[in-house]
């Protein structure tokens, strides 16, 4: 499909789901600087291949916001697509949030994939929408619904980093985290950034180009450590070593249902700038 055809298909799905405005970030599910091919929804829907930018799709317009590094490239790649270029930082050019505030009205609905927008930004948008009498829908990956030949999620083999190179065992690192949790009065700790998880568990992978990380989430409580990842990427010996250190492997995408099981009075440590919106749903007390 051409970019125009993709946008038309997206608009049809938006209409079916009664979503008036759809936001498409560049982000993956982990706030990574570089993203794998599976996550390049903004590239797919606009044709713009730069590393930074956001798209907003409505029934009567489509826009791309990007910074000064990409003005020339974006203008060339968007030509003939019907996607309008918004040059970030230029005079009289609204930010994405300013644009949404202007366009959204009573009874309208803003949608985005809640796995790709941070909890912090989702809170800001929720507040903005409340003032406008609009609603938010974050359960659907609409671009994924029309992307027929979408690349698969990466599942590169995981390796274990020997403690002589890591400098500290994962057991000792996890003990230090739990001590910090106790000092802060936290019952749980949710970690979503891939480099932090790789460091904490002394594992390395190849799921992001030029970055030795493993697609995963980690949840730690006072008694459990749960790693949400594709078990097929782990050898039997690494799975056994992780198990001996108290780490249980669960399916990668089951994190979203798991966080909903948190007790309402459970206090959870997480970074709302990095953790995505859907990783915080069901969590009332966040530090």
Where are the predicted features?
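N-terminal accessory/capping or targeting/presequence segment of soluble
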Residues: 2-105, 117, 121-262
């Amino acid at each position: 499909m051409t970019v125009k055809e993709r946008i038309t298909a997206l608009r049809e799905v938006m209409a079916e789901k009664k979503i008036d405005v759809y936001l498409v970030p560049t982000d993956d599910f982990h706030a990574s600087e570089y993203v794998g091919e599976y996550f390049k929804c903004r590239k797919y829907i606009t044709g713009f291949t730069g590393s930074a930018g956001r798209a907003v799709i409505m029934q009567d317009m489509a826009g791309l916001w990007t910074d000064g590094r990409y003005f020339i490239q974006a203008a060339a790649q968007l030509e003939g697509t019907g996607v309008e270029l918004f040059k970030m930082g230029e005079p009289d050019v609204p930010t994405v949030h300013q644009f949404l505030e202007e366009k959204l009205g009573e009874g309208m609905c803003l949608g985005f994939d809640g796995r790709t927008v941070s909890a912090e930004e989702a809170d800001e948008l929720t507040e903005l929408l409340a003032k406008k009498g609009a609603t938010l829908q974050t359960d659907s990956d609409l671009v994924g619904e029309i992307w027929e030949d979408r690349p698969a999620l990466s599942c590169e083999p995981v390796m274990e980093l020997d403690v002589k190179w890591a400098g500290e065992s994962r057991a000792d690192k996890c003990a230090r985290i739990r001590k910090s949790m106790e000092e802060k009065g936290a019952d749980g700790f949710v970690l979503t950034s891939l480099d932090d998880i790789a460091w904490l568990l002394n594992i390395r992978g190849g799921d992001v180009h030029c970055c030795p990380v493993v697609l995963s989430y980690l949840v730690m409580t006072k008694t459990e450590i749960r790693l949400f990842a594709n078990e097929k990427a782990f050898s039997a010996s690494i799975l056994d070593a992780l198990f001996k250190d108290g780490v249980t492997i669960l399916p990668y995408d089951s994190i979203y249902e798991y966080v909903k099981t948190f007790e309402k009075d459970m206090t959870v440590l997480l970074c709302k700038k990095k953790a995505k919106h859907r990783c915080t749903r069901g969590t009332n007390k966040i530090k």
